[in-house]
Design a protein with these regions (language model features):
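Electrostatic cytochrome c docking/interface patches
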Residues: 1-19, 33-34, 38, 63-65, ...
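Electron-transfer interface patches adjacent to heme c in soluble/periplasmic c-type cytochromes
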Residues: 39-164
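An acidic- and aromatic-residue-enriched active-site/binding cleft used to recognize and process polar
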Residues: 23, 28-31, 72, 103
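Sequence/structural segment immediately N-terminal to covalent heme-attachment motifs in c-type
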Residues: 6-29, 43-46, 159-162, 167
Length: 168
């Protein structure tokens, strides 16, 4: 699938936070080919979409919504919506039983691990260019700063290096 690209460094860090916090326990990332799912979440998932997921994040339970198409088309939510949702989920989704993650606003992204993660994924076949590790954190901070600026426009002041930024 030509539209499938390796994770950006910020997305890679966010994926690892997602795994660390056990988000996959309540959220799936695979839309099954059932009418009820495609009407709610969009086009069903294809096997090739997961070629760079290690470990895969399909999930097996849906306490929360499927996240495979989150951030696209009708499912797109603003950066400040996501920030507020991580801080206090029930304030953004009435009846949500998702726990709050206020510590994500305090903890810094582990940028010291970025190069090793990219190197490991390259060994597994992810097509990161040789030497990409040398400027990956610069790219990570550029993307993170863009999110930080979007949050600032919404009145939210937070440094670009916080873990919540990697999950938005």
């Amino acid at each position: 699938i030509s539209s499938v690209k390796p994770y950006t460094p910020l997305e890679l860090q966010g994926r690892d936070i997602y795994v660390r916090e056990g988000c996959y326990v309540c959220h799936s990332q695979m839309i099954r080919p059932f009418r009820s799912e495609t009407e709610r979440y969009g086009e069903y998932s294809k096997a090739g979409e997961f070629v760079y997921d290690r470990p895969f994040q399909w999930g097996s339970k849906r306490t929360g919504p499927d996240l495979a198409r989150e951030g696209t088309d009708k499912l797109k939510k603003s950066d400040d919506w996501h920030f507020r949702h991580f801080r206090e989920p029930s304030s953004m989704s009435e009846g949500s039983i998702m726990p709050a993650y206020p510590f994500l606003m305090e903890q810094k992204i582990d940028t010291a691990s970025t190069a090793a993660k990219i190197g490991a994924l390259r060994k597994l076949g992810t097509p990161y260019a040789v030497g990409y590790e040398q400027f990956a954190n610069s790219e990570l901070m550029t993307q993170a700063n863009s999110i930080r600026l979007n949050l600032k426009i919404s009145g939210i002041e937070i440094p670009a290096d916080r873990e919540v930024i990697a999950l938005i």
